[in-house]
């Protein structure tokens, strides 16, 4: 059983789930991964998990399953995991493969998910839906990592030589791959709402503009739950109206607005000096987004 823990806020809930599963199904193998889990791996292992992935786990999970199917629990050959052996935490810190070409990743198996149940429950993004609204939605990523390295963010620490390796490096799927995934979601699964989970959708602004232009004809609603960096919505400190209008035309209805701080010193010291508070027309930016019916 695998349980992801991405944010600190999820930690208590995930560890409680682990406790309940171990109580009722002690023979089950419990895995965890994600940002929160990998940086707090020892606590997760002491809390009942058998294995924690300490980097991206697209290949790791397959290797674990291959060993488990043989009836073994010898994880010693699998890189970038921590696990429990005879009551002790073992750290397999040898480096594994960091996937730089995201088109190498297998096509997401959305068809294996009980999507109709997700649509009824409306979680984990249910807070962005109307109270009585049932939306046929799915999540996807067009990129991994981020071009910035802010001190408060895990990405700034996920560099070459770190425990997870350089998975914070900004990497993208090709335009063709992104459009193939979107068309599949709409045409094969009937999805109408897509949550973009990228840490930095506009990390390459020209690429993002190309994608938005292609998405227009799909007639989908788009939301970016992690936010779009303010600097990418600006041109010389003013609202980039071309981009904002294109977002609306492509179907963007909602996204998080990551101001990060209202203090210029904090932005410069801890937030990669991404934008200049004193020379940015934030009020104009907000008005431009609202004018285009984009909720923040």
Segments the model singles out, each with a brief description of its role:
Residues 1, 24-26, 47-49, 190-194, ...:
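Short, surface-exposed connector motifs at secondary-structure boundaries
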Residues 1-101:
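Glycine-rich beta-alpha loop elements in corrinoid/cobalamin-binding modules
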Residues 108-295:
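Radical SAM [4Fe-4S] cluster-binding motif and immediate context
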